[in-house]
Amino acid sequence: MSKIFSIKNLKCGITSADWLPTKVNCGFTLAEGATHVNLPPTKVKCGFTLAEVLITLGIIGVVAAITIPTLIHTYYEKQTVSRLLETTSILSQAIKTSEEEYGELGSWGTPSRTPEYGELVFNNLKPFMKVANICGIVDDKEQCFANRYALLHNRGYTGYNQEKPKYKFTLLNGSAVSVQGVSSNNNLQINVDVNGVSKPNIMGKDLFLFTYDAEKRSLLPMGHPDSMYPYDTNCVAKDGTGYGCAYYVLKFKDMKYLK
């Protein structure tokens, strides 16, 4: 069955099976002499109200405030762990190779907290490392290390460049390193700031301590159970100084003690 509707010159043919909108077939004939159809403009307004926009922006702001600090912390932690692992490997390999070349570290001279001994150690290590900058004993312009570092968990500050016997330099990977003899034994004290003078300049966040045990011929991160600053009391503990964090980072590959 078919019905024909005629409205002025508009004709639509609709069969009983054509009631779905997609099946409506409409046509019209132009009046005599007409060349086009003048249809009234159709206005469609789409948009959000000011209240809706403000609510959406508020939600975005809350989500950003929650997620962005977490993302930044995660990135910083991964970068620090990776840099410390890399620098530890560089120093261990340099010491090992230099001992093969010049003899065991204990035979390089009498270990002491003197500028001369620190420079001697550096000169023996230098051929086996990619050094970017040499600051030496005096680093008043803070080209390698900052002048002052905060202790972990707001425990105050410690001077650094004022401790003159340390011989300081930076590696191509961005880490700053200082070497210093220890007069009481054949050990060597080595400190690493994984991002040089850049902040945060906090013990246990970017500054980490090591010793080289000449008898064991091993670079030991401060914080190992037998060290003078075990990591459980000098890193993980809420009142820890940060002196023992190197061992924690290298062992667990994270910095969860900051959370």
Labelled PLM ranges:
Residues 1-48:
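N-terminal leader/signal peptides at the extreme start of proteins
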Residues 70-91, 95-98, 102:
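Aliphatic-rich helix starts adjacent to a transmembrane/signal segment
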Residues 58, 64-74, 90, 243-259:
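Long hydrophobic alpha-helices with heptad-repeat/coiled-coil character
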Residues 36, 109-117:
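Intrinsically disordered, low-complexity coil segments
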Residues 92-111, 131-134:
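Alpha-helix exit/C-cap motif
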Residues 115-259:
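Intrinsically disordered, low-complexity regions enriched in Pro/Ser/Thr/Gly and acidic residues
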Residues 29-31, 44-76:
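N-terminal single-pass transmembrane signal-anchor helix
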Residues 23, 42-43, 71, 223, ...:
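Intrinsically disordered, low-complexity segments enriched in proline/serine/threonine
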